[in-house]
Every structure is written in C-alpha cells, then in structure tokens.
Amino acid sequence: MISQATIFMLVLLVIALLAKNQSLLIAVLVLLVIKFIGVGDKVFPFFQQKGISLGVTIITIAVLTPIATGEIGFKQMGEAIRSSYAWVALLSGVVVALIAASGIDLLKNDPHITTALVLGTILAVAVFNGVAVGPLIGAGIAYLTMKVVQWLGSFWG
C-alpha cells in the first residue's frame, strides 16, 4: 500500500513537472529515492535539522563566487557605489536578507508553513509566470505579514 506521504510527494512531482519547476522536481525526486531505497529514517531527520542551514550556505557560496573568481573586486564595488541604482540594490539586498532571516525562524518553528509556501510558489510559477525565489524570502514575508496583522489586531482586538 502506498503511504499518504508518498502520494503527496507524487502529487508534488506532477505539479513540479506541469509547472516546469526544476528545483521542486529535483527535491521531490531526491526525497522519493531516499524513501524508496530505505534510508529515509536516517537521512530525513538530518535534512529537517540541517537542510535550511546547508541551503543558505550553498546560496552564500553562489553569491560570493564572483568575488572569488575576480569578476567582482574593489574596483567594481567602488564604481557601483557611485550609482543611485546601486544604492537601491544595496538597500534591497539588506532588506531581503533581514526578511529572509525571519523566514528561517518561521520555517524551523512552524514546518507546515513550508507546505503552504511551496504550494504558493508553485501556483505563482504555474499560473502567473512567476519566479520561484525560494521559501526563505516567502517565509520572511509571511512572518512580517503575521507580525503586522498581530500589531493591527492589538488596536481592534
């Protein structure tokens, strides 16, 4: 008998294929393979505990790679800070990183939010031609929205 978890993963696999979401497709396939070869009991807890941190580390490596390769150096940084657009980008990068930090805590403390974020991302990609920016920023935005709703509720509650 196929478990509910496997059926859910197969549904996500179909959605990933329909939405042409490569990241979701790879993630679902990796998890299904781990489950089917019987090492899920050992691997899944590790992913749950360390997965987000490892993912953030990989993203950070990708962001720092142009510095390591020499594509971005002090000269480019100096040129960039002379542009008003660069200052907007710098501020945006700071804000997004701070929002995403709140998302990490939300994902760790409220794992069912991950499912809603994945479904929202899939919907946006499949229906609205959106871009999957990842669950951290989505969780961060959700966290901020929840805090604003709580704050507004304190006036009317």
From Swiss-Prot:
It comes from Halalkalibacterium halodurans (strain ATCC BAA-125 / DSM 18197 / FERM 7344 / JCM 9153 / C-125) (Bacillus halodurans). GO terms for cellular component: plasma membrane. The chain crosses the membrane at residues 1-21, 54-74, 87-107, 117-137. It is a multi-pass membrane protein. The keyword Ligase does not apply. Keywords: Cell membrane, Membrane, Transmembrane, Transmembrane helix. It is found in: Cell membrane. This is UPF0756 membrane protein BH3161. InterPro entries: UPF0756_TM. The keyword Transit peptide does not apply. Belongs to the UPF0756 family.
